[in-house]
Each structure stands twice: as structure tokens, then as C-alpha cells.
Amino acid sequence: MMQTKNWMALVGLTCAAFIFNTSEFIPIGLLTDIANDFLTTEAQAGMIISIYAFVVMLLSLPLMIVVSRFEMKKLLSSVIFVFVGFQLLSAVSTSYYMLMLSRIGVACAHAIFWSIVSPLAVRTVPEKYKSLALSMIVTGTSVAMIFGLPIGRVIGLHIGWRMTFLCIGIFAFVLMIYLMLILSKVPSRGTFSLQKLPFLFRKSVLLDFFIISFTIATSYYTGYSYIEPFLKQVAGLQDNWITVTLVIFGAMGILGSLAFSRFYNKNPYKFTDFVLLGIFGCLMLLQAAACCSLTIILLCALWGMVFTASNVVLQAETINNSPIEATAVSMSIFSGIFNLGIACGTYIGGQVCTHFSMSDIGYAGAVLAFITFIYWNKIIKKKMKEKAVCC
């Protein structure tokens, strides 16, 4: 059984996942205000988001290698402290470039945080609760999508966008104190150097999961990056129903993470079959479902559930197939690859919208989702079953 202290630590880590992802999403809802304040275009203000993702992608691995020898509780506290400092810098930024610098600092903290939070959550709980720990971390991300961005936007609209960053910084500081008090020391599992990377990549199944992490993220964000204009222009939903649909989308992600904790360990192969086929099916049927408000809302609900479930599967198998001393580094590689997939998916979706039609974004994503499903079934699943027999 889980002790109260385990639960309290896990809830604290889930809240940390919520606040880090809220911070990542926040500028999306504040771009117009930021652009107006600094007398720039929204496109220029949008570079804050693009550069943030690029920094996370580029620095996840090298930063994690540098800090891999540190005790994990102390490392987490330091990362949140840096996060708080740069949030406060965002709140007092007097120029576009000062804000950009502060967001780069937040991105560096983000890169390390997402490399350690899942391994830390797994090590905080008893063995039988590992799936629950991972699902709760991803639930924090889903809740950020549902509530974090809207709350941040409301704060920004009423008392200024700077106050949004200030509130995030204050919340994170309180959370840092809480985690310092409640978390037990979690020793590092050894240093990791660049010389060990070739050995890590010789872990065949791990490399396969890195590959499909990229293809899943790319296929998903080919469609999801443009879901708002798709719902408006193709499905013909009104603004209030678009908001409702996106909230349902995120809320069903919580159900997906709970489904993982309940069913994945019982039959990981069938569960992964279901979520990968679900992603393919949702993308393939996106245009057809747009004929009716009810069908597109139901499709988005299923899409949110299966994608979130697939994300937890990828994180779980990245940890399961990594050497004990390299789990945090493996997660940093996963984070970088996933962010690359986000960038590629957004680019592909944009090209489809430009050269074909917005109604075709689902088909473009479905092609890659189908290739992912075939790769999983013909290669990865076979290797995992052979490995299970050998063990």
C-alpha cells in the first residue's frame, strides 16, 4: 500500500507538471497583449513560443548529462528555483528581448524538469504503483491544457500579462518549499557521459520507442496544431463550442492516463494497439466527422484520450528499456525528440493548409500514424515478446 507521504509527494510532483506545462502554454493566450505592449507584430511575439520549443529540444540532453550526478531532490528544487527566477524576470521585462531571455531561461529549467520528473515519480512510489505515478504526471499536463491556459489568460486580461507570469512564479515557489519538505532524498543513479551514448542507442527497443515517439508526435500535431481553425472553418462550430470542445479534448486526456494505470500492465500489447489505432482512426475520420457538431466533439474526445494514453506508454517504455543509471538521460532524449515531432507536425500541417486544404490535415497526419502502427506491430512488439521470452 502507498503511504500518505508517498501520495503527498506524488501530488506535489503532479502539481509541478501542471505549473511547468501551464507556463509553456501561457504565451499562446497572451500574444496579442505582449505584441501590443512591445510594439511588435503577433508573428514576432510568437517567436517566444518557437524559440522556447527549440531550446527545450536542443538542450534537454546536454543539460541532463551535465546534472546527472546530482541527488534528484536537490536537483528538482534547484530547477524550480531557476524556473521561479526567470518567471519573475518575465514579469518585470521592459523589452521584447528581455522577455525572450527570460523565456529561454524558463525553457532550460523545463528541459531538465521533464527529464527527471517521470523517473522521480516512479522512484517515489512502491513498485506496483509505477503506472499510477506516470499517469498522474501526465494528468498534470492534461489539467494544464484544460485550466492552466484559460486561467492565465483571464489573469492577463484583467490585471496585465506580466501578472500572469508573476502568479506562476509565486505558485512555483510555494510548490518548491512543499516538495523540499515532503520529498525524501532520491540519490542519483550515477553520472552519464557522452561516451556512453552509443551504448544507450544500442538498446534496440529503446531506439525503436524513440523513433515512434517522433512519428506519433508529428502525426498528432499535424492535425492538433490547427484544430481551432479546423473546428471553425471546416466543422463550422461557434467560438463558444470550440472552447467547449477543446476543454473536453483535454479532460479526456485525464481519462486516457487513468486507463493506462488500470489496463496497461494487464496487457501492454493490446493497450498499445488500441491507442495507436485510435490515433490513426481519429485523424483519418477528422474531415468526415466535421459534418456534424456532435460527431466532431465525440471524435475529439476519443482523440484526446488515446493520444494522452500513448504519451504515457512512450514514457513508461522509455524508462523500462533504459539502463538504471540512464533513465533521466533517456527521458531527456525523449523530451527533445517529442519537441522535434511537435515542430515537424506543425510545419507539415501548415504546408497542407497552404498547398492543399485545412480539411486535409487529418489525412496527412493519418499517413504517419498508420506507418507508426505498422512499425509497432511488425518490429517493436515482436522484439518485446522475444525479450519477454528470454527473460
Regions inferred by a protein language model and the residue ranges of each:
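Helix-to-loop junctions at the C-terminal end of transmembrane segments
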Residues: L59-E71, G256-P268, C353
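A late C-terminal transmembrane helix in Major Facilitator Superfamily
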Residues: N321-M358, G365
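Helix-breaking motifs and short loop linkers at transmembrane-helix boundaries and internal kinks
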Residues: L39, E71, V92-M98, A109, ...
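Intracellular juxtamembrane helix-capping segments at the cytosolic ends
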Residues: I112-V125, A309-P323
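Helix-loop-helix hairpin linking two adjacent transmembrane segments in secondary transporters
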Residues: M98, E127-L181, Y226, F230
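Paired small-residue
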Residues: V82-L89, Y97-G105, L294-L302
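Cytoplasmic helix-loop-helix junction between adjacent transmembrane helices
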Residues: S102-G140
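Conserved MFS/SLC helix-loop-helix module at the cytosolic interface between two early adjacent transmembrane helices
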Residues: L58-T94
